[in-house]
Regions:
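Chalcogenol-based redox active-site neighborhoods
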Residues: 1-163
Length: 163
């Protein structure tokens, strides 16, 4: 497990709120999802092989996440039109949010922006129904972190029993 910088959203602390484009004409705020767990999936870029495999895996496991009433949100610095084409190509059924302008602002607030490459690190956060970070993980850039850690974290939430 890679270490997160001390500036990262810490386990036990409130998750930084944000409002990002989910479509060209709609924005989604993290605070709008209070009352249910949220999985934030920061990833470097649409169309890269590892990122494509990672989000496709989560798409296949949506019923597992939803068994915990969890919402999953993908976040990268790509623009909304790029996300739209990528989601359509991969047949994704969860929002991809554009951390595009200002570039990487949300990734920076979570402590997972890679300045040298101008992309988000491959990072996962599980946020509980009250908006508190309960688990976080940064994977090496070329490694798909899979879903086991996410599912374990969801299981450990106070109301982590499956519905």
């Amino acid at each position: 497990m890679a270490n997160l910088p001390s500036s990262a959203a810490a386990v036990g602390q409130a998750a930084p709120d944000f409002r990002l484009h989910s479509t060209p004409d709609q924005k989604l705020a993290l605070s709008e999802l209070r009352g249910r767990p949220v999985v934030l999936v920061f990833y470097p870029a649409d169309w890269s092989p590892v990122c494509g495999d990672q989000v496709s895996l989560y798409n296949e496991l949506l019923s597992e996440f939803r068994a915990y009433s969890a919402e999953i949100l993908g976040i990268s610095v790509d623009g909304v039109w790029c996300h739209s084409a990528f989601a359509s190509d991969r047949k994704l059924h969860f929002p991809l949010l554009a951390d595009f302008e200002p570039k990487g602002d949300v990734a920076r607030r979570y402590g997972v922006y890679e300045e040298s490459d101008g992309v988000a690190q491959r990072a996962l956060f599980v946020i509980d129904a009250d908006g508190i970070v309960r688990w976080r993980y940064v994977s090496p850039i070329g490694i798909n972190p899979g879903a086991d850690g996410i599912l374990d974290a969801l299981e450990k939430l106070p109301q982590g029993n499956r519905t």
